[in-house]
Each structure stands twice: as C-alpha cells, then as structure tokens.
Amino acid sequence: SEGDPKGIELSHKNLLTNIKQIGELLNFHKDDVILNSLPIFHSFGLTVTTLLPLCEGIKMVSVADPTDGATVGKMCARHRVSILFGTSTFFRLYVRNKKFHPLMLQNVRMVIAGAEKLKADVKEAFKLKFGLEIYEGYGATETAPVASVNMPNLLDPETLQEFTFNQAGSVGMPLPGTIIKIVDL
C-alpha cells in the first residue's frame, strides 16, 4: 500500500493454507529448485520464496539482493533453478542486465510475478530475452498473500480442447478453495 504501514494479523493456519494452495497449483517435481530472492519483510517473499519451499520440502537457493541481476542469473544457472518468483521491477532489471544471459534460466519451468502489477512491456521483453512466459498473480498481505494466479493453458488430449488459465491483463483464477467476489462500491 502507499499509506502508513499497518500490522496485519495472520494465523499460522492462514499462512499454511496459502502455502498448500500454491503447492497444489504448481505441481512440484522432485527436482524443483526455488530461487529465494524476495525480501522476507514482505508477505509475498516470506510466503512463496521462504516458507513454501521449507514446508513443501523443495530445494531453495537464496540470493540476498534481488536487484543484482548478474548474481541472480549465476545462482539460477549453478543450482538449476526451476521456479522463479519476482516482481515486475526485478524482471525488468534482469532483462536490461547484459550479464544476465538467457541460458542462465534454461532450467526454469515457471516464472510468477506478484507484489505489483506486471507491466506488459516487461512481460514481452522477458519472453523475448529468456523465452519464458511470466504468469501474473494477485494478492495482498491480508490474503496471506496469494489470492489468484495465472497458470499455463492446458490441452485435453482426448478432446483437444484448450483450457485457458492464462489471460493477459488478468490476475488469474482464484487459488483452490478460494472464492472471490467483485463488488462495485
């Protein structure tokens, strides 16, 4: 938010439920590696890049400074990072960093943006440089923090019908077990 900082009270159950919901969507593989580069003083960083891998038993690689694109790239390459969380701002830095080579992300299978609106030009430039789609999510600290996320579209092999889970300009589908209501105040 842009106002004065406020404390938000979340229970252990809030956090663990959100972690479980995210885990169900990401369908972890036994060899997955998550890059932990988001600050843990922010609910998105604490939940998805710190608590999620710890609770789900996923290997985690930590980088202290997410704005240091060269180090982020090196860590992704060295440790075969497969899941990358970030913000539009950080992804823009990676695109612009000449030391961040596209092959450094060759093991990444999922890139998810949160904490701020994913800018269309960032999404496009990231795909152009790295060949990877960024899936945008939505949440707030009060939602512990993820409420919805775009995911890759799926094709039913029997009917060849495409199921759309990724819509440009949208924040995606609600997490499993989540009901969202939009109201006009």
Give the ranges of each region predicted by the language model.
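Conserved helicase ATPase motor motifs in RecA-like P-loop NTPase domains
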Residues: 1-3, 116-117
